[in-house]
Design a protein with these regions (language model features):
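Intrinsically disordered, low-complexity N-terminal segments that are enriched in acidic
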Residues: 1-80
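Generic structural "secondary-structure junction" signal
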Residues: 21, 64, 79, 116, ...
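Short, charged/polar, Gly/Pro-enriched secondary-structure boundary elements
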Residues: 80-81, 205
Length: 267
């Protein structure tokens, strides 16, 4: 499989700050990667510092004064990355409640709704289907500080809201779950996409309750407890405004078929 992804971002900085971008794909061990990444501040090229986070996540950090910052990324991936490794520390970390996936608010509800499927592969289908039918995908309907409980009460949201609710419900029935930011060929509207990843029977499996794109062709960018760990841009100290952003993701040939009944791992 050959996949091509790209992102173009323009940010206005109105007070000096430190920026952290997470737009480069995670190190795809086992796949062939060709990529380019460039940043400018007021038209001048700047070399970022690359920090490596968990699960191959790459964060590019630099200081920026007032003016215009641009980020340009493009990558071609040939083949599939190796399955995500399983570490004991991850199985502990991704069971805990977090800022946007507050599993402790769902213990009783999730046990009643899904307890009979706990620790089974059927659970993944049941939770994903339940969230997908309970929520309406409405761009702009949620607030950036909304968590899973807010989303359930509102009954609507975008991809990160769907993923947070899936994650919270899974953690509430003792299944480790985490959020993954991905490039998603076929996604409409095209954007950075957020999905859930759950650990069952020795494997990390990807869930997308929005069903907006086939999971088989998704490309991992960053992985964490929730959106607090995976945002494509973090701003520290100053003030910024997102002016323009274009994301593209395509696969060579036809998009793969997908079914909520399938067990799929990112690769």
């Amino acid at each position: 499989m050959k996949r091509e992804v790209a992102a173009q971002i323009e940010v206005a900085v109105t007070a000096p700050t430190t920026l952290e971008f997470q737009v480069a794909i995670a190190s795809p061990l086992g796949a062939q990667l060709t990529e380019s990444l460039a940043f400018t501040v007021n038209g001048k090229s700047i070399e970022p510092r690359e920090m490596t986070g968990p699960h191959g996540t790459r964060i590019h950090k630099f200081d920026a004064g007032e003016g215009t910052v641009t980020a340009s990324y493009a990558a071609t991936i040939i083949g599939r990355a190796d399955p995500a490794p399983v570490r004991e520390i991850d199985l502990s970390t991704y069971l805990r409640p977090s800022r946007y996936a507050e599993a402790d608010k769902f213990y009783g509800f999730a046990a009643t709704e899904f307890g009979q499927y706990a620790d089974s592969e059927t659970l993944l289908e049941k939770v994903s289907s339940w969230v997908g039918t309970r929520l309406n995908y409405v761009p702009g309907s949620s607030d950036p500080i909304d968590g899973a409980a807010d989303t359930l009460l509102a009954g609507s949201g975008v991809c990160r809201d769907y993923a947070h609710l899936v994650i919270a419900l899974l953690r509430a029935v003792n299944v480790p779950a985490r959020l993954v930011s991905v490039y998603a060929p076929g996604c409409s509207p095209m954007d950075f996409h957020a999905v859930a990843e759950a650990y069952v029977h020795g494997h990390w499996r990807v869930l997308d309750a929005t069903c907006l794109a086939p999971r088989q062709s998704m490309v991992r960018i960053s992985t964490g407890r929730d959106a607090a760990d995976t945002a494509f841009l973090d701003n520290h100290k100053g003030a910024v405004t997102l002016k323009n952003m274009t994301v593209t993701a395509i696969v060579d040939g036809d998009l793969p078929g997908d079914s909520i009944h399938e067990l799929v791992s990112l690769g």
